[in-house]
């Protein structure tokens, strides 16, 4: 905070827009404070004047003040200097931009080269984005070689003949050089034009000349560009002219930016930037000197280059092709660029993420005895962190105590560290000596230590999802670690092996409210990621739950009673035991009956439930049945208590609420842990030992496996193995061995598992689900199994072995890493080694994966961080682009979604009819579920039948739509909001529905109710066509579920709901549906990114070829995810899934035909061998094998081939028969292809398809006739033939589609919806390909183009377009994520897909995608390419409107997200019901401030006269709509805090000088009371009517009749000296207590209660109901309270009736009743702004500390009765005069708004109205006393 401005509690105004630009040389000079001339920093130990550490630039030394702003080191921000460069220099960041501009304009006259009429130029003008526009213009200009328009004069004649002369560009005709950049130079190349008549020989010298362009030359070109041209080029001449991109003046950053470090007492070590600047200054001086001395050009250019180099490296020291500037040590200097860049740079390291105060970090330890939303905090932390609490009447006592304890409270207590006064002064309680300094007033802030129950944020890095930061309530505990409940570890992903976690203490009410409402642990139990809970019962508690709920668990009385003690809600009633004789015993299930909430119904199965067991209660007790909160049957295990979808925790959270779920998790732990403690559980080595028979079985299994492997090896070596499709023989062998060995391990394991007894402790843990799995048991007991590296068996490391002592090429199990021992038996050394290899790979994988997924997550978050739900329900980003019209297409929040079953989908037609259709036409139809009269209606009334027919046909169309459009895969469970089935079950239980009785509902009612309900379930309100359509789409799926579940026949027949139960269900569905809608302001982009990124961290990095997944290998896991979101051009395993037409897909043969047609077959793939022979006689041959077929071929030659033309060289190709058959090729086909390809250049003969060997013989045909030159030719022929051979093998396609390298056939199950029988599944054949060529494949006639798809996104967008690619993207993401069994809710994936596709092209989630958006430069630069983006932003003068998250975080503002997205308004209606605040008398200790003796002017009678009602009772102040802080129940004591009482805010309309409330003529001065009229003598301070001795206060007030005994002037309470009379007591004004915490009104002896105040008389005019004197804050205004009767003798101020216990305080006092007039709508007292922080006095340039309420303070001189402000004749009081009359001695000094305290001249620094300790009369008082006080000072004339 800058000390030059007075303290202000007001909020700092928000930055609305950030404008980027380039500083012009003039601006740099103007904003600088000095011209830096010297490169030295210090001289004789002092900063050198004019040097780099000049004190005018700002100070970095605590002892030195800044010369410019006179602030100290902490406050001075630093001031820039500047350096005049000897020559202009290039700015390295703008080189490329300057080059582009130079290429666009004429080198000579700076006009744009392109013609404005040109088409390209016009295109460019349409582009808004300046950077792209420049690119386009450059495009238009790049071919121009000269500046058009100059030569027009020469060709004037030609124009006359042409069409009218084109408007000349006015160019200069100069030839344009070709510009390039080399390093730091710009180079211009001129092409020298030869004149036509020149002889070519005459110019021997080169026809080009190069010249280096200095920045000065470029600058002169850029300076000439006109402003209009700048705009055309996309620059903004106001903020960034092109010529400013060249440095003429270098700004010198102040020392605070480049601080130096003290090495020892004398020497300082300077920052890199300082060194670099010193170099620049030095070289600049050198250059200047050389120019002055007139050095030769080449020397000057060398010096220029050197300076240019230093300036460049000062900006960016990582330039490509430039040497690094280094320090003496050889370390490269850190340039400005590298300060901004990267993770630790300014943007990401200091703006996006900073270190914060009020945080703590320590190790975590478990504590199952605290609640899940609690956090044990060490005392050492609690006594160090603070929370600022504002002093209010309610907490002042407590805070006083804390302040007394101070920073080092006694053991077991917390204290406070600081007091912050209302003027911003901070008192450190460590150093406060006097107790008077600790004095608290309302409105002060106390920074108190943390207390039990404070809310904090708790976090564990890496914060991968929303639940990594949650809110906890703290509980201070001994020792030094955070204590955490065990159930909360899963969302944090924490364990207690030394993890540390961070705690942050929120520092304001708003933050605490958000923590409490949005982030508390119970609110986070259900996560939107997979719409399931993320917390459940874990570890020993889970094990205990399994053990305690077993059937044979009984609990003794003593244990059960002790267990009850852990139950918080225990009411002393012990539940009845299950067994009474021989002694009372309780079952373990009864413990759960205590803690499951009563409205819960649940039906689930245990993890080990076998489908064969059926019935209500299964033999294995595996069916968990909870009804009405009672566990009736079933053993609880991880499936019920864990984090699965629909688990008990989930149901409790959804049905009863977060708090119930919290209690359940807590109670389960406490009760079960206590029982487990009594019961005990242990596990030892004995639990892993299997019995001897099992061991024999295991050994047998393993030896069998070994035999099988030996067998495989024999087959493999004998080449007898059949290769599997798509695999080589070796792959096949490895795969088979792996299968055999894995099966052996599993079999051994399962036999071991079966042998373990029910009592086995290891098994207990596995079945409960608390630790371990089936595979762990089998590895411990039976056999560890095969060790893999990279998904294969351990490879041969060297020389055909894995380890040296195995034989060569040993493929046996032992040698290749099969561990046959169990952990129990121990591993042999080589087994141990292989096991270590496998384990090491896992570690490496994890380490590599972490960084990969971390980067993916960061990119996802940056791409989607600004996507949120707006108030119209649409999903948009910060630019306002619509990403989705409804979140997840249905507008539901993922948290409230559950998986529900669509019953009608799987039903056969007959079942469907039985469930939904009334058989009305059947004669004998006599249903048991309808009452007789309803049945008559159904049979008799025609209209009713139409209703039911309509219902039935709707259900039928629903079912058809589900089967054909929605759930095409036949899956009947879908995530939908509102679990209807469970609501029905709850209703049956709540309303005690008897399933044997008939329902009293008429079926028509049900149909109507459901129809009406559907109309009420609005997601998109509005009745225009679009809204209606959108609403229909959004709710279609849910309505289908609703209609089929609440079909009238089902309600009557299945659920038997009574009318009231049915209505309850309907109501419940409606309210739950609306609750499930997503909240506007929700940042779903971030949630989506986290929901995708978090499962990615759990994925495996390299996915191996899983044994038997499929023949084709697909990339999965992280690499595939990376490919998808990077939109990779070349993916690792491109592949098509080709579906065939029904005919082709029926049989394998059909599929085989298509496979052959698609697979790209080259000659090579069917060739066995090729040979080149010299075979001189074409008609015969020297190869015996071929002799026969050649002769027979030429016996009947096809065409006339002259043998002499045939080359003697022969290419002989032997084809592979199997492949030919497989590919369905014939010899003739191949020969035909060859002839087509090579025409008559080759001759080709082949043998029969059935011959033993298939041979092709190919020879070259030579055109030359006779073999005259035989020798030479044949030499070339064989070479040529070899070339042809290789070409043929690779290039020649025999058939198939290019790029489709392999095609595999596989059989898949296909489910198809069938009207009659529900879903039918059938097998069909389909093809998988390696390689992609979607377009060509889809053209094949047997391929089904609708289903065929590719995994290559770019191909899909090219072939099928953007909508198709969105769907493909979704499916691909689905595949990757669900591959290892994860599930992510659809809406998150949808947000990602829509983000990537909504622009109409695929936006990769990389810097090339995200940063090419039109978001603000600040947001883009926080991702990647920081410096480039900022430089571009400056060059093109971009603006950032700060609409995103990142930008606001950088500026430290509240981003428009979540709660920051809306404005808050006050509900005036609610205020009428606010509760009045009765202040207790807590002020005794502060009375000293009040005694008249201490009040400097209290003795004068006039002073007492000041009580005159004109001042106190006039309702004027209440007219101010803003001035109601007076009433808010809160403010009672805050009145002294400038931040609390808007009533005084200078901007309050009530204070405007013209406000009628202040003009004495204002009717507000109740006309019935002459005492208020300005002409009334009562105004004159000497008026006897007001003199304290006057018997009557106001002639019109009957209750003042002088005869009233208690008013008699002799009444003791009247004595003017009575302290209780101290006129300064503001309690006389109806606004009273709210204004003065020090008011005696709070002390029991206070006169505030004395009847002398007219305000107490019930008949007093000031009581009129509109009169504010009903101040709710005044404790004693109840007119009917007995103690107020005017005649009541108990009025003496000392009367006990005033003690705070006085009945007057009783809340039943009518003044609390809402009918009390003070609650009337006219009562301004409840105003929105009440306790808010109104800026009130804060702006006054004068003494900041005087709170606006000060006029009441007894010590304040304002009260001096001589002050003219009280006399109507005072000029400053004249009613017509605005209060700011120039004669007002003070107002001149302050701007009108500030006047309330203008009177307090700034020389009153220590004056605090209530602290008499510091009070000294200053000039201010003297003026007051002399009567020159300005009216505007006191409330009356207050502006």
UniProtKB/Swiss-Prot annotation:
Stretch list, region Disordered: 152-174, 1538-1839
Misc. remarks from the entry: The binding of ribonucleoside triphosphate to the RNA polymerase II transcribing complex probably involves a two-step mechanism. The initial binding seems to occur at the entry (E) site and involves a magnesium ion temporarily coordinated by three conserved aspartate residues of the two largest RNA Pol II subunits. The ribonucleoside triphosphate is transferred by a rotation to the nucleotide addition (A) site for pairing with the template DNA. The catalytic A site involves three conserved aspartate residues of the RNA Pol II largest subunit which permanently coordinate a second magnesium ion.
Annotated source species: Arabidopsis thaliana
Binding-site residues for Zn(2+) 2, renumbered to this chain: 106, 109, 147, 172
Domains (record comment): The C-terminal domain (CTD) serves as a platform for assembly of factors that regulate transcription initiation, elongation, termination and mRNA processing.
Family listed: Belongs to the RNA polymerase beta' chain family.
GO biological process: transcription by RNA polymerase II
Record field: compositional bias (Low complexity): 1538-1726, 1747-1798
InterPro entries: DNA-dir_RpoC_beta_prime, RNA_pol_asu, RNA_pol_II_repeat_euk, RNA_pol_N, RNA_pol_Rpb1_1, RNA_pol_Rpb1_3, RNA_pol_Rpb1_3_sf, RNA_pol_Rpb1_4
Function: DNA-dependent RNA polymerase catalyzes the transcription of DNA into RNA using the four ribonucleoside triphosphates as substrates. Largest and catalytic component of RNA polymerase II which synthesizes mRNA precursors and many functional non-coding RNAs. Forms the polymerase active center together with the second largest subunit. Pol II is the central component of the basal RNA polymerase II transcription machinery. It is composed of mobile elements that move relative to each other.
Compositional bias annotation for Basic and acidic residues: 156-166, 1818-1839
E.C. code: 2.7.7.6
This protein's name: DNA-directed RNA polymerase II subunit RPB1
Subunit structure as annotated in this protein's UniProt entry: Component of the RNA polymerase II (Pol II) complex consisting of at least 12 subunits. Interacts with RDM1. Interacts (via CTD) with PRP40A, PRP40B, PRP40C and CYP59. Interacts with MEE12/CCG1 and MEE14/CBP1. Binds (via CTD) to ATX1, especially when phosphorylated on 'Ser-5' of the heptapeptide repeat.
Residue segments, region Bridging helix: 829-841
Cellular component terms per the entry's GO annotation: mitochondrion; plant-type vacuole; plasmodesma; plastid; RNA polymerase II, core complex
Residue range(s) of DNA binding per entry: 326-397
Location(s) in or outside the cell: Nucleus
Residue positions binding Mg(2+): 495, 497, 499
Annotated Polar residues bias: 1727-1745
Record flagged with keyword Transcription: yes
Chain residue ranges for the region called C-terminal domain (CTD): 1544-1813
Record SUPFAM superfamilies: beta and beta-prime subunits of DNA dependent RNA-polymerase (SSF64484)
Modification after translation (UniProt): The tandem 7 residues repeats in the C-terminal domain (CTD) can be highly phosphorylated. The phosphorylation activates Pol II. Phosphorylation occurs mainly at residues 'Ser-2' and 'Ser-5' of the heptapeptide repeat. The phosphorylation state is believed to result from the balanced action of site-specific CTD kinases and phosphatase, and a 'CTD code' that specifies the position of Pol II within the transcription cycle has been proposed. ATX1 seems to regulate phosphorylation statment.
Binding site for Zn(2+) 1: 66, 69, 76, 79
């Amino acid at each position: 905070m800058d000390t030059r401005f007075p303290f202000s509690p007001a909020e700092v105004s928000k930055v609305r827009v950030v404008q980027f630009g380039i500083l012009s040389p003039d601006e740099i000079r103007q904003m600088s404070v000095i011209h830096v001339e010297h490169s030295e920093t210090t001289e004789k130990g002092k900063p050198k004047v004019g040097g780099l550490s000049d004190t005018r630039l700002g100070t970095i030394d605590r002892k030195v003040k800044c010369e410019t702003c006179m602030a100290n080191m902490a406050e001075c921000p630093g001031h820039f200097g500047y350096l005049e460069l000897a020559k202009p220099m290039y700015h390295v960041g703008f080189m490329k931009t300057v080059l582009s501009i130079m290429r666009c304009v004429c080198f000579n006259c700076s006009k744009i080269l392109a013609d404005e009429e040109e088409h390209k130029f016009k295109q460019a003008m349409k582009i808004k984005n300046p950077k792209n526009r420049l690119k386009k213009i450059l495009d238009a200009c790049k071919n121009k070689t000269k500046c058009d328009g100059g030569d027009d004069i020469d060709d004037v004649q030609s124009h006359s003949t042409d069409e009218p002369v084109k408007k000349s560009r006015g160019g200069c005709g100069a030839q344009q050089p070709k510009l390039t950049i080399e390093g730091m130079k710009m180079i211009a190349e001129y092409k020298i034009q030869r004149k036509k008549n020149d002889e070519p020989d005459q110019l021997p010298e080169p026809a080009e000349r190069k010249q280096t362009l200095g920045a000065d030359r470029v600058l002169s070109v850029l300076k000439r560009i006109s402003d209009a041209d700048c705009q055309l080029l996309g620059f903004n001449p106001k903020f960034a002219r092109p010529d400013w991109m060249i440095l003429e003046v270098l700004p010198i950053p102040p020392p605070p930016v480049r601080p130096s470090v003290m090495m020892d007492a004398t020497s300082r070590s300077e920052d890199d930037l300082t060194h670099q600047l010193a170099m620049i200054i030095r070289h600049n001086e050198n250059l200047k000197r050389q120019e002055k001395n007139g050095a030769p050009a080449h020397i000057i250019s060398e010096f220029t280059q050197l300076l240019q180099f230093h300036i460049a490296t000062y900006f960016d020291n990582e330039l490509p092709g430039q040497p690094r500037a280094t320090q003496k040590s050889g370390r490269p200097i850190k340039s400005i660029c590298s300060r901004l860049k990267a993770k630790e740079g300014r943007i990401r390291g200091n703006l996006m993420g900073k270190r914060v105060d009020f945080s703590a970090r320590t190790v975590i330890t478990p504590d199952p005895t605290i609640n899940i939303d609690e956090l044990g905090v060490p005392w050492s932390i609690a006594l160090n962190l603070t929370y600022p609490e504002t002093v209010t009447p309610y907490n002042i006592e407590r805070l006083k105590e804390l302040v007394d304890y101070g920073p080092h409270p006694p053991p077991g207590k917390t204290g406070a560290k600081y007091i912050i006064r209302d003027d911003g002064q901070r008192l450190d309680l460590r150093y406060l000596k006097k107790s008077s300094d600790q004095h608290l007033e309302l409105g002060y802030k106390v920074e108190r230590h943390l207390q039990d129950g404070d809310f904090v944020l708790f976090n564990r890095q890496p914060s991968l999802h929303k639940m990594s930061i949650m809110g906890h309530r703290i509980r201070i505990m001994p020792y030094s670690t955070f204590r955490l409940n065990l159930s909360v570890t899963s969302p944090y992903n924490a364990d207690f092996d030394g993890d540390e976690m961070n705690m942050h203490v929120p520092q304001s009410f708003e933050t605490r409210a958000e923590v409490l409402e949005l982030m508390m642990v119970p609110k986070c139990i259900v996560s939107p990621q997979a719409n399931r809970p993320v917390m459940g019962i874990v570890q020993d508690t889970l094990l205990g739950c399994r053990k305690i709920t077993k059937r044979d668990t009984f609990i003794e009385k003593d244990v059960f009673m002790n267990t009850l003690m852990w139950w918080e809600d225990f009411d002393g009633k012990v539940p009845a035991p299950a067994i009474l004789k021989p002694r009372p015993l309780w079952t373990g299930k009864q413990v759960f009956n205590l803690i499951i909430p009563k409205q819960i119904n649940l039906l689930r199965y245990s993890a080990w439930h076998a489908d064969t067991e059926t019935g209500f209660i299964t033999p294995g007790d595996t069916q968990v049945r909870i009804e009405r909160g009672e566990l009736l049957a079933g053993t609880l295990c991880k499936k019920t208590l864990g984090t699965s979808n629909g688990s008990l925790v989930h149901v409790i959270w959804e049905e009863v609420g977060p708090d119930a779920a919290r209690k359940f998790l807590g109670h389960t732990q406490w009760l079960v842990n206590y029982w487990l403690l009594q019961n005990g559980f242990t596990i030892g080595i004995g639990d892993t030992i299997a019995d001897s028979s099992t061991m024999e079985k295991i050994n047998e299994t393993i030896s069998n496996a070994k035999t099988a492997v030996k067998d495989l090896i024999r087959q493999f070596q004998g080449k007898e193995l059949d290769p599997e499709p798509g695999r080589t023989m070796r792959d096949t062998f490895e795969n088979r061995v792996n299968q055999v060995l894995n099966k052996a391990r599993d079999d051994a394991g399962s036999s071991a598992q079966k042998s373990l007894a029910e009592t086995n402790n290891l098994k207990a843990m596995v079945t409960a689900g608390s630790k371990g799995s089936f595979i762990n048991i089998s590895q411990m007991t039976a056999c560890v199994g095969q060790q893999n590296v990279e998904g294969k068996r351990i490879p041969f490391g060297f020389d055909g072995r894995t380890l040296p002592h195995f034989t060569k090429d040993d493929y046996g199990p032992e040698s290749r890493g099969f561990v046959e021992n169990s952990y129990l038996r121990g591993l042999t050394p080589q087994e141990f080694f292989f096991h270590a290899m496998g384990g090491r790979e896992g570690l490496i994988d994890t380490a590599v994966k972490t960084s990969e997924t971390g980067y993916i997550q960061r990119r996802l978050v940056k791409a989607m961080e600004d996507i949120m739900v707006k108030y119209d329900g649409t999903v948009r980003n910060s630019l306002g682009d619509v990403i989705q019209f409804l979140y997840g297409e249905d507008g539901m929040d993922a948290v409230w979604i559950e998986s529900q079953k669509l019953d009608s989908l799987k039903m056969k037609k007959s079942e469907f009819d039985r469930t939904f259709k009334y058989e009305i036409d059947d004669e004998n139809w006599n249903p048991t579920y309808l009452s007789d009269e309803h049945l008559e209606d159904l049979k008799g009334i025609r209209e009713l039948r139409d209703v039911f027919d309509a219902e039935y046909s709707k259900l039928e169309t629903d079912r058809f739509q589900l089967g054909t459009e929605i759930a095409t895969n036949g899956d009947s469970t879908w995530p939908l909001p509102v679990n209807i089935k469970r609501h029905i079950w709850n209703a049956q239980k709540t309303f005690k529905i008897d399933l044997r009785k008939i329902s009293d509902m008429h079926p028509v009612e049900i149909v109507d109710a459901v129809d009406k309900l559907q109309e009420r379930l609005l997601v998109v309100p509005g009745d225009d066509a679009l809204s209606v359509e959108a609403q229909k789409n959004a709710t279609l799926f849910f309505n289908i579920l609703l209609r089929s579940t609440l079909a009238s026949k089902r309600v009557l027949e299945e659920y038997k709901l009574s009318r009231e139960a049915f209505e309850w269900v309907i109501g419940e569905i409606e309210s739950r549906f609306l609750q499930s809608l997503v909240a506007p302001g929700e940042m779903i982009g971030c949630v989506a990114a986290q929901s995708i990124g978090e499962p990615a961290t759990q994925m495996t990095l390299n996915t191996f070829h899983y044994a038997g997944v499929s023949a084709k290998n697909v990339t999965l896991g992280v690499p595939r995810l990376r490919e998808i979101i990077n939109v990779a051009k070349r993916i690792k395993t491109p592949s098509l899934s080709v579906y065939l037409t029904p005919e082709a897909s029926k049989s394998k043969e059909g599929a085989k035909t298509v496979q052959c047609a698609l697979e790209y077959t080259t000659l090579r793939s069917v060739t066995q061998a090729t040979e080149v022979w010299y075979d001189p006689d074409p008609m015969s041959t020297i190869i015996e094998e071929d002799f026969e077929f050649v002769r027979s071929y030429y016996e009947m030659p096809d065409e006339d081939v002259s043998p002499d033309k045939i080359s003697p060289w022969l290419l002989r190709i032997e084809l592979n028969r199997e492949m030919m058959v497989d590919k369905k090729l014939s010899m003739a086909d191949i020969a035909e292809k060859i002839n087509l390809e090579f025409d008559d250049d080759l001759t080709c003969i082949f043998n029969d398809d059935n011959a033993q060997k298939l041979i092709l013989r190919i020879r070259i045909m030579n055109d030359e006739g006779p073999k005259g030159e035989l020798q030479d030719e044949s030499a070339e022929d064989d070479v040529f033939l070899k070339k042809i051979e290789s070409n043929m093998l690779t290039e020649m396609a025999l058939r198939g589609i290019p790029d489709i390298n392999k095609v595999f056939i596989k059989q898949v199950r296909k489910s198809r919806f069938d009207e009659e029988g529900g879903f039918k599944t059938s097998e069909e054949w389909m093809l998988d390909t390696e390689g992609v060529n979607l377009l060509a494949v889809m053209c094949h006639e047997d391929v089904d183009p609708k289903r065929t798809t590719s995994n290559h996104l770019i191909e899909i967008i090219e072939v099928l377009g953007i909508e198709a690619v969105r769907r493909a993207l979704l499916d691909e993401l689905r595949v990757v994520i669900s591959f290892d069994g994860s599930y992510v809710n659809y809406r998150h994936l949808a947000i990602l897909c829509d983000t990537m596709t909504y622009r109409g092209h695929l936006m990769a989630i990389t810097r090339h995608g995200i940063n090419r958006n039109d978001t603000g430069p600040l947001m883009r630069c926080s991702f990647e390419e920081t410096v480039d983006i900022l430089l571009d932003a400056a060059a093109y003068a971009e603006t950032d409107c700060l609409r995103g998250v990142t930008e606001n975080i950088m500026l430290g503002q509240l981003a428009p997200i979540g709660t920051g997205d809306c404005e808050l308004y006050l509900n005036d209606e609610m205020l009428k019901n606010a509760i009045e605040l009765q202040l207790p008398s807590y002020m005794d200790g502060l009375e000293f401030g009040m005694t008249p003796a201490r009040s400097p002017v209290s003795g004068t009678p006039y002073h007492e006269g000041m009580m005159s009602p004109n001042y106190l009772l006039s309702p004027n102040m209440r007219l101010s709509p803003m001035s109601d802080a007076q009433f808010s129940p809160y403010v009672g004591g805050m009145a002294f805090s400038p931040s609390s009482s808007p009533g005084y805010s200078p901007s309050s309309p009530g204070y405007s000088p013209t406000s009628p409330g202040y003009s004495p003529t204002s009717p507000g001065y109740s006309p019935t009371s002459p005492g208020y009229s300005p002409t009334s003598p009562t105004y004159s301070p000497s008026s006897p009517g007001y003199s304290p001795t006057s018997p009557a206060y106001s002639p019109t007030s009957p209750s003042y009749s002088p005869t009233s005994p208690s008013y008699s002037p002799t009444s003791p309470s009247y004595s003017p000296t009575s302290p209780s009379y101290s006129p300064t007591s503001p309690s006389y004004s109806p606004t009273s207590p709210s204004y003065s915490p020090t008011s005696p009104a709070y002390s029991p002896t206070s006169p505030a209660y004395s009847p002398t105040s007219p305000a107490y008389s019930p008949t007093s005019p000031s009581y009129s109901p509109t009169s504010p004197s009903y101040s709710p804050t005044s404790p004693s205004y109840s007119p009917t309270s007995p103690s107020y009767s005017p005649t009541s003798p108990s009025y003496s101020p000392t009367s006990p009736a005033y003690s705070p216990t006085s009945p007057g305080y009783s809340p039943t006092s009518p003044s609390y009743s809402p009918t009390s007039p003070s609650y009337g709508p006219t009562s301004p007292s409840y105003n929105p702004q009440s306790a808010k922080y109104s800026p009130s006095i804060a702006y006054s340039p004068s003494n900041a500390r005087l709170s606006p309420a000060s006029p009441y303070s007894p010590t304040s001189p304002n009260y001096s009765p001589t002050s003219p402000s009280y006399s109507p004749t005072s000029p400053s009081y004249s009613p017509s005069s605005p209060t700011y009359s120039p004669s007002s001695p003070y107002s001149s000094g302050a701007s009108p708004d500030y006047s309330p305290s203008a009177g307090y001249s700034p020389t009153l620094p220590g004056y605090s109205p209530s602290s008499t300790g510091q009070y000294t009369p200053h000039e201010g008082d003297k003026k007051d006393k002399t009567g020159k006080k300005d009216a505007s000072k006191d409330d009356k004339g207050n502006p």
